[in-house]
């Protein structure tokens, strides 16, 4: 395991600071998931996953419901899922996931954010191979040993379980996200502090001085883009 959640979450802090931005991004993601299949989360696994994630960010129920109702309507707005890979200062690697109804606009915006802030766009696969796609769950009130026992009883294998920051963090294969979550719920665990699929860097680097300043400006510029849903990188940030 290249990264612990206690460190990964520091990378998320700048994006997570603005509730209105989080709500808007989840509104689009929920709409797309509901539009791609049945708008009922009980029968639409993709939609159920997005809603579970939204709950860990405290997205209000009315925003979730509004996005689902919009998907039930006659609108035919089409969104594409895109991934951009690139490089920042001094060996830093960045992955940008976007959800857009205008591919050309998004590509131009992401490219401009890189070029104006000391970064460079890479080709597909130039960065992603240095990250591990990972399902992550956070549970309070139980320790790693207790969760391991629960999962073993349910015959569910995971990569690792660690006690971090006053909670137990489960790392699993991304394709096992729903199996792990349903197994935990069957054991009586209904609330999660984290329920995500993340790209975790295999190795982190440290930046300082001007390189760190440039990097933080680049990440801010990418996260501020309307179509960007997630930004992953391999830089260790201070608390």
From Swiss-Prot:
<keyword id="KW-0238">DNA-binding</keyword>
<dbReference type="InterPro" id="IPR017856">
    <property type="entry name" value="Integrase-like_N"/>
</dbReference>
<keyword id="KW-0804">Transcription</keyword>
<protein>
    <recommendedName>
        <fullName>Probable transcriptional regulatory protein lin0388</fullName>
    </recommendedName>
</protein>
<dbReference type="Pfam" id="PF01709">
    <property type="entry name" value="Transcrip_reg"/>
</dbReference>
<dbReference type="GO" id="GO:0003677">
    <property type="term" value="F:DNA binding"/>
</dbReference>
<keyword id="KW-0805">Transcription regulation</keyword>
<dbReference type="Pfam" id="PF20772">
    <property type="entry name" value="TACO1_YebC_N"/>
</dbReference>
<dbReference type="GO" id="GO:0005829">
    <property type="term" value="C:cytosol"/>
</dbReference>
<keyword id="KW-0963">Cytoplasm</keyword>
<dbReference type="InterPro" id="IPR026562">
    <property type="entry name" value="Transcrip_reg_TACO1_YeeN"/>
</dbReference>
<dbReference type="InterPro" id="IPR026564">
    <property type="entry name" value="Transcrip_reg_TACO1-like_dom3"/>
</dbReference>
<dbReference type="InterPro" id="IPR048300">
    <property type="entry name" value="TACO1_YebC-like_2nd/3rd_dom"/>
</dbReference>
<dbReference type="InterPro" id="IPR029072">
    <property type="entry name" value="YebC-like"/>
</dbReference>
<dbReference type="GO" id="GO:0006355">
    <property type="term" value="P:regulation of DNA-templated transcription"/>
</dbReference>
<dbReference type="InterPro" id="IPR049083">
    <property type="entry name" value="TACO1_YebC_N"/>
</dbReference>
<comment type="similarity">
    <text>Belongs to the TACO1 family. YeeN subfamily.</text>
</comment>
<dbReference type="InterPro" id="IPR002876">
    <property type="entry name" value="Transcrip_reg_TACO1-like"/>
</dbReference>
